[in-house]
Swiss-Prot record:
GO biological process: DNA repair; interstrand cross-link repair; protein monoubiquitination
Chain residues that bind Zn(2+) 2: C329, C334, C364, C367
Molecular function GO labels: ubiquitin protein ligase activity; zinc ion binding
Region (UBC-RWD region (URD)): 110-293
Summary of subunit composition and partner proteins: Interacts (via C-terminus) with FANCI and Fancd2.
Name used for this protein in its record: E3 ubiquitin-protein ligase Fancl
Length: 381
């Protein structure tokens, strides 16, 4: 028997104007708007023996009233399933009863005609809510994680998947006069941002990204291990100018940070524009690969359950904001491992008037060795 998710997936892929509801009795109710060529039909389909079609009741709006269709006045083939029924419905319903979109309204930019013209594309998924008040584009070709949500018919921006620094709402107001123009603008931005996402893709796949977690298409920062107790923080301030706005910070014990900063400086001066960021970083630090998660088979202890990874202050591994314990001191034998925010709060309770991890102050609360000022970068997201 088809689940509610199966029916919703079918409607999402082929009939974006329809929504389904499964009743506890097993019956299925499908309601909404079904489009075909220049014709829209508002309907309600009741299937008491879902997924079978026998006993169906179909209510179709004609003018201001709903007309009831059953097996008595609507011919169905015996082997039809729900998808066959909906596919053939525009052909088996009386054509003269179907309301059509006036051509003059089409020329003037009728929003529902625009939806009908756009929803058949295989390059994205189009969904409309039951009230026809919101439209969502998602699963774009080459950009599967991205989405655009607009209020209709006003085309007011509701949500999107681009970084927050992209002023999409302002761009839509200035440059998009109809639904197609809004969609084309968003897709153009995706193409313009391709280098931004491509540069992060190798890092996300080939490095052990610790922060942010979970990664989304809105994030402009990646923090991942360079070696034991040493981390790289990559930030791209302007997604439209990846290399020009890129910043790299090395985080870890003082001596290691000082040495690696010289390596970083030399590497940046010899940057290879033919390589992406990931390959340049490997070449810069003379590495074949960065530390990666353990992908081996066999039982592994979950990070949240691994006591060795937990913060020495809050005794948790990952905070609600996605932060993990990365702070350690210059003493390699010290057990200190904690979140930067936890250590900052701990120091605030002890030292009035002191600023955590400034040059003038920063000692390990366990062994009194020096705390590198580089860890302050963890607090500046």
């Amino acid at each position: 028997m088809e689940s509610n998710e199966d029916v919703e997936r079918l409607l999402c892929q082929k009939y974006p104007g329809l929504a389904a509801e499964l009743q506890p009795s097993g019956a299925c109710i499908i309601r909404g708007v079904l489009g075909s060529e220049d014709t829209w039909r508002r309907l309600k389909l009741y299937l008491p023996h879902h997924p079978a079609l026998h006993g169906f009741q179909l209510y179709v709006q004609e003018s201001l009233e709903y007309k009831l269709y059953t097996s008595a006045n609507l011919k169905l083939q015996d082997d039809w399933l729900l998808e066959d029924f909906l596919d053939h419905l525009p052909k088996i319903l009386p054509a003269q009863k179907a309301p059509t979109v006036p051509k003059e309204l089409c020329r003037e930019g009728n929003i529902y005609y625009d939806i009908l013209a756009l929803y058949k594309s295989n390059e994205y998924c189009l969904q409309v809510d039951e009230a026809c008040s919101m439209i969502r584009f998602s699963e774009f070709t080459d950009f599967e994680q991205h989405y655009l949500e607009l209020k209709i018919p006003s085309l007011l921006l509701l949500d999107h998947s681009l970084p927050d620094c992209v002023s999409l709402g302002e761009m839509l107001t200035k440059s998009a006069g109809n639904l197609e123009e809004a969609l084309n603008l968003f897709r153009k931005l995706l193409e313009d941002l391709r280098p931004f996402y491509d540069n992060f893709m190798d890092i996300d796949e080939l490095c052990h990204v610790l922060q942010p977690s979970p990664i989304s298409s809105k994030h402009k920062t990646r923090l991942f291990p360079l070696k034991d107790r040493v981390y790289l923080k990559l930030t791209i301030a302007d997604p439209f100018a990846c290399i020009a706005s890129m910043s790299l910070k090395i985080i870890g014990p003082t001596e290691e940070v000082a040495r690696l900063r010289h390596v970083l400086s030399d590497g940046l001066s010899n940057w290879d524009s033919e390589m992406n960021i990931h390959k340049n970083l490997l070449r810069m630090f003379d590495l074949c690969y960065f530390p990666m998660p353990d992908w081996s088979d066999g039982p592994k202890l979950d990070e949240e359950d691994n006591e060795e990874l937990r913060c020495n202050i809050c005794f948790a591994y990952r905070l609600d904001g996605g932060e993990v314990p990365l702070v350690s001191c210059d003493n390699a034998k010290c057990v200190l491992k904690c979140h930067a925010v936890c250590l900052e709060e701990w120091f605030k309770t002890l030292m009035d008037g002191k600023t955590f991890l400034e040059v003038s102050f920063g000692q390990c609360p366990f062994c009194k060795a020096k705390l590198s000022t580089s860890f302050a970068a963890l607090l500046n997201d």
